[in-house]
Amino acid sequence: CDEGKLRLDSKVFGEDGILKHITEIKDSRAKDITVRHLLNHTAGFSRRMGDPMFRIADVIKWEELDTTPTADQLIAYQLRQRLRDRPGGSAQYSNIGYLVLSRVIEVASGKSYEQYLQENVLWPAGCYDMHIARNYYEERYPMEVKYYGNDPNDRIESYDGSGNMRPREYGGNDIRGLQGAGAWVSSAVEMMRLVASIDGKPGVPDILSKESVAEMRRITRKGDYALGWARYHESTQTLVRTGTMSGTCAYIEHKASGISYAFLTNTSNYRGASFTNSLGTMIRNAMSRVQEWPTDRDLFVEVPNTEEATGSES
């Protein structure tokens, strides 16, 4: 929005919408969905048939497709269902909503979602090793960990409709296809670089305007989501973002004091979202016992290449 290519209240679907090329819409109320509704999960999308982002093999069967559905095909599938509520009504977390946002970014920018985020958000924030995930262990990035699901013997039908049985974290789910709904590969350090670049605090230059930083936190109704964040506790001015799926969990918190932290795992358990909340409680309890924080560690300082500085050879 800071670039003027979008507005939070821009319509997404319909003749005047950003994604006007997706024309088959069952519920006319969907034409009222805005970028803001997608960001705070009030678009009204139904999950009566489950979360399509994690039912790709079923969507292939239901839609009689020959290949894995594209983002537009998944969005079109969702729009052939009635909304569960009017846009701007009650909030319900929606992965498909964040896939729609990914396509909004692509159409508005003329670039792939990954390329645009890297060039205009991540690299300016100093995050040079964040990428959209790949689906199989042998395709992992050079510094990427191995993921461990809840049960090493757990297998589900491959997302690609082949009928093969795969681990959920490696081919069972289409992780790459999640795009903005949860496909990013990152380290905790890079996550903190990003948070420090959008927190509105002095010290690290923000990549967003003051107005956009404030807008992210603006909540007008109890129970609503902050824009891009899971929760904003106005009384303590604390921002929280969580995430969990087979093979990984994440918890990020930013406090009014300027202290932020990220906790990422390469495993998961059956507790799902409640596990990430337990992580937050554990870290807050540990932090309350810290009397003094080190001041000699700045992750934003350029560290010289030791070998070049000393002239050593490999």
Annotate each PLM feature:
Residues 1-4:
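Juxtamembrane transmembrane-helix termini
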Residues 6-25, 124-125:
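Short, glycine/proline-biased beta-turn/loop segments that scaffold the active-site neighborhood
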Residues 21, 139, 269-270:
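Flexible, glycine-rich phosphate/dinucleotide-binding loops
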Residues 24-238, 242-244:
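Short, surface-exposed loop or secondary-structure junction motifs
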Residues 249-271:
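Short, well-ordered beta-strand elements
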